[in-house]
């Protein structure tokens, strides 16, 4: 089997050296070339035709975002961004994902060599995922048409969504058309700390419903979406007649924290048939068991179809496990989940 050919673009000679060490330490991939800036990278891409590009966000001569935008227009290819953990870095990274980057890696703030080498397995996994990703499904999405406001629903009704690779754009596409009359939404997207708040703030500006990073103990309200904070699990709990959010530092589940399974299992227990579960694009099997639990508790469950997924991993696993009632294209998810949740009477659990 041929190796995954990687080209790394970074203005730091140390980072280029570290990325080369990491990539070449895995038997199924090789670093074919490195470039100090996008202008050099342009020629090397033509020469080496890599399978995956790793791209630093902030560089001299040409900004990483400008280069990414041109690359996706002229020669689309899988790109993994390398970003700093600053607030500005997280906003730029989210913009890169919007432009077509498949995923991102965050640079450690201290001890960069030791930190990056400790990330070796994670970086290799992201490169493998990017090499297999569907670029057709990851074209920048146009703004979806706003859905008409429906009747106000019982606060017992809610929607739970899980996603990973490719999920930031898929979630935007699902939330943007939702009217203020929508039920509450609880969302787990695999993301490191520092990025979930920027992600929520970005969505809040784009959507009619309120979107925020979830906080422990807060009441779950209709017309709002709550994003699980990075590196912390989010669960649905009850406080008397109301739903509330529980945030905790339990062990990683399916190697993830936050975990989609943790959210879905709690929704199955607390909301049962009053919920709709949605699993979107992502690598691995996180959410499959939880979605089955939701279906068995009476919830209606949706999975994004393969044609519209950047990575058809999590939806496939959920389908194979028997947890999915319906498979739909990303363009239909918002409409379908609202129609489904509006159909049945709320049952007090």
Swiss-Prot record:
Keywords: Chemotaxis, Cytoplasm, Hydrolase, Phosphoprotein. Disulfide bonds: none annotated. GO terms for molecular function: phosphorelay response regulator activity; protein-glutamate methylesterase activity; protein-glutamine glutaminase activity. It is found in: Cytoplasm. SMART domains: REC (SM00448). It is an enzyme of class 3 (hydrolase). Phosphorylated by CheA. Phosphorylation of the N-terminal regulatory domain activates the methylesterase activity. It holds the Pfam family Response_reg. The keyword Cytoplasm applies. It catalyses: [protein]-L-glutamate 5-O-methyl ester + H2O = L-glutamyl-[protein] + methanol + H(+); L-glutaminyl-[protein] + H2O = L-glutamyl-[protein] + NH4(+). The active site is at residues 164, 190, 286. Transmembrane segments: none annotated. Its EC number is 3.1.1.61, 3.5.1.44. GO terms for cellular component: cytoplasm. Its main location: cytoplasm. One of its GO terms (biological process) is chemotaxis. Residues 5-122 form the Response regulatory domain. Involved in chemotaxis. Part of a chemotaxis signal transduction system that modulates chemotaxis in response to various stimuli. Catalyzes the demethylation of specific methylglutamate residues introduced into the chemoreceptors (methyl-accepting chemotaxis proteins or MCP) by CheR. Also mediates the irreversible deamidation of specific glutamine residues to glutamic acid. Contains a C-terminal catalytic domain, and an N-terminal region which modulates catalytic activity. This is Protein-glutamate methylesterase/protein-glutamine glutaminase. The gene is cheB.
């Amino acid at each position: 089997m041929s190796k995954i050919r990687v080209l790394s673009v970074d203005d730091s000679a140390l980072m280029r050296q570290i990325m080369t060490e990491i990539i070449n330490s895995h038997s199924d991939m090789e670093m074919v070339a490195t470039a100090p800036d996008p202008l050099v990278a342009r020629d090397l891409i033509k020469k080496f035709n890599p399978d995956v590009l790793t791209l630093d966000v902030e560089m001299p001569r040409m900004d990483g975002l400008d280069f990414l935008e041109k690359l996706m227009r002229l020669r689309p290819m899988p790109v993994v961004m390398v970003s700093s953990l600053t607030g500005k870095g997280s906003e730029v990274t989210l913009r890169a994902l919007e432009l077509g980057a498949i995923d991102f890696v965050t640079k450690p703030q201290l001890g960069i060599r030791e930190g990056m080498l400790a990330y070796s397995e994670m970086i290799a996994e992201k490169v493998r995922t990017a090499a297999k990703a569907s670029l057709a499904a990851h074209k920048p999405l146009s703004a979806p048409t706003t859905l008409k406001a429906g009747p106000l629903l019982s606060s017992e009704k809610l929607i739970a969504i899980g996603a990973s690779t490719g999920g930031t754009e898929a979630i935007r596409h699902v939330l943007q058309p939702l009217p203020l009359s929508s039920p509450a939404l609880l969302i787990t997207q695999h993301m490191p700390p520092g990025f979930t708040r920027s992600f929520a703030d970005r969505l809040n500006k784009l959507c009619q419903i309120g979107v925020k990073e979830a906080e422990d103990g807060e009441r779950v309200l209709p017309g709002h979406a709550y994003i699980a904070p990075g590196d912390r699990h989010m669960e649905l709990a009850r406080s008397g007649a109301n739903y509330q959010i529980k945030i905790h530092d339990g062990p990683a589940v399916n190697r993830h924290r936050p975990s989609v399974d943790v959210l879905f299992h709690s929704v199955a227990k607390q909301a049962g048939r009053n919920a709709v579960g949605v699993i979107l694009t992502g690598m691995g099997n996180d959410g499959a068991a939880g979605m089955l639990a939701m279906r068995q508790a009476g919830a209606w469950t949706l999975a994004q179809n393969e044609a519209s997924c950047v990575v058809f991993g999590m939806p496939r696993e959920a389908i194979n496990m028997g947890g999915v009632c319906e498979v739909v294209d990303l363009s239909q998810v918002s409409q379908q989940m609202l129609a489904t949740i509006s159909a049945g009477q709320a049952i007090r659990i």
